[in-house]
């Protein structure tokens, strides 16, 4: 018998969002881990807010929503609010009831700034790493470091001389006065003399010889070699020396004082970096750069089987950067300023680790999260 296409919808539903989400949905495991971490962060949240006044967006829901935005590659917070309004799965993950009103995007952004000031993303990331360590998913001896550029949320047209008081006037007859045509040919531009009027902390940099120069930030990842989890992250100005500075800083921040190995590509093969890494009790398993010069490491390092393993494992760090670009929405930045960019990059790394924990725990016999 053919069913009727009834257009009259019922006013009430007796099923909760919890009952609608499949028991084996990947977000369930991620939600469990996230809830445990947020419960541990409760005291930090309490210190961030006054005891009196109008209630804000609960920081737990705010952070869940931001994690969801990363996991589902939602391009903007406005689109996130739109999807929270009608997406049942998203409402369940964030903790919104079916009839609960979604926040205004401006209010959401203002509340996020409070989390930024308290460096909540860094604490959240640290607790995610702690969860992975509790499941014995991370090595504390073998690591890989790498860095790359992130294209800033600013165009080259905004890169102007620092002493230029007035905005560049559009040419007469320009068909688009709001986005005037600018000719850069013959103009010498550098970070010493020019600055972006859109994002003053973004610097002009290129990934390599012959590559296009773009306004960028420099992002860095310290990966443990057992399962490719992110052990630490850092974002610095793209000044040309940021890769080595960030690598040494992250190694110095590792807990304990036991010797470790540190895999890296040819960009880290310098006498100064190798010497400073060894001072930090890190054996530099860097790829040798013998082009036009002598490598900073020799057979005393490369002859060991561990060196070859490090060189094989270090390539996995590209999976992290790839995930952050395609899923995490970090191919081109949506935020401005070093602090906010670093905050979002740290939260994206935490989201990546959450996915890895869920996948690895599922693959382990009798694994649990």
Regions found by a protein language model. Give the residues of each.
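Basic, low-complexity intrinsically disordered segments
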Residues: 2-5, 11, 15, 27-137, ...
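Hydrophobic, well-ordered secondary-structure elements that form the walls
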Residues: 65, 80, 104, 221, ...
């Amino acid at each position: 018998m053919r069913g009727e296409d009834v257009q009259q919808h019922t006013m009430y539903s007796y099923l909760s969002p919890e009952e609608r989400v499949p028991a084996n949905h990947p977000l369930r495991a991620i939600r469990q881990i996230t809830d445990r971490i947020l419960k541990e962060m409760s005291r930090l949240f309490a210190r961030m807010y006054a005891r009196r006044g109008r209630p804000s967006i609960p920081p737990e829901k705010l952070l869940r929503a931001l994690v969801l935005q990363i996991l589902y590659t939602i391009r903007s917070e406005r689109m996130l609010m739109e999807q929270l309004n009608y997406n049942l799965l998203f409402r369940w993950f964030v903790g919104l009831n079916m009839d609960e009103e979604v926040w205004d995007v401006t209010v959401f952004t203002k509340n996020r700034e409070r989390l930024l000031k308290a460096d909540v993303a860094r604490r959240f990331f640290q607790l995610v790493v702690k969860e992975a360590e509790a499941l014995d998913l991370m090595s504390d001896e073998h690591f890989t470091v790498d860095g790359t550029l992130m294209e800033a949320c600013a165009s080259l047209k905004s890169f102007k001389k620092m002493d230029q008081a007035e905005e560049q006037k559009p040419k007469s007859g320009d068909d688009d006065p709001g986005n005037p045509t600018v000719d850069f040919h013959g103009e010498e531009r550098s970070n010493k003399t020019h600055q972006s009027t859109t994002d003053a902390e973004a610097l002009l940099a290129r990934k390599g010889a012959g590559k296009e120069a773009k306004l960028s930030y420099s992002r860095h990842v310290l990966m443990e070699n057992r399962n490719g989890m992110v052990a630490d992250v850092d974002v610095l100005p793209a000044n040309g020396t940021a890769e080595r500075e960030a690598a040494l800083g992250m190694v110095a921040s590792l807990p304990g004082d036991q010797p470790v190995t540190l895999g890296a590509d040819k960009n880290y093969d310098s006498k100064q970096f190798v010497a400073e890494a060894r001072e930090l009790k890190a054996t530099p398993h860097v790829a040798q750069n013998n082009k036009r010069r002598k490598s900073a490491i020799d057979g005393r390092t490369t002859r060991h089987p561990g060196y070859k393993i490090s060189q094989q494992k270090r390539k996995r760090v590209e999976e992290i950067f790839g995930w952050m670009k395609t899923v995490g929405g970090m191919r081109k930045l949506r935020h401005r300023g070093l602090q906010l960019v670093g905050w979002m990059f740290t939260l994206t790394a935490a989201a990546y680790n959450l996915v890895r924990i869920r996948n690895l725990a599922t693959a382990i016999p009798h694994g649990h999260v």
